[in-house]
Regions:
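Residues at the starts of beta-strands that form the adenosine-phosphate
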Residues: 2, 30-33
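Short, glycine-rich nucleotide/cofactor-binding loops
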Residues: 3-15, 41-48
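Histidine-anchored nucleotide/phosphate-binding helix
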Residues: 14-27
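Short, intrinsically disordered/low-complexity patches at protein termini
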Residues: 29, 38-40, 57
Length: 60
């Protein structure tokens, strides 16, 4: 299956879950592309104690 994920927010939980979904999908042999739109382009710079976004992005 092919998935396209559009991230249009800089809310830590939403961004973390989007990349977690993408990583899990890749591990299950699906094709995944992520498009950052609007505030989503700030994803890599988001700091959160509860959600390790940088780790999820690196795993992706």
């Amino acid at each position: 299956m092919k998935f396209g994920i559009i991230i249009n927010t800089n809310e830590p939980e939403t961004v973390w879950n989007a990349f977690r979904f993408g990583t899990t999908s890749l591990l299950n042999d699906h094709e995944v592309k992520v498009f950052l739109l609007g505030k989503g382009v700030e994803s890599e710079g988001i700091e959160s104690e509860k959600f390790n976004i940088k780790e999820q992005i690196q795993l992706f």
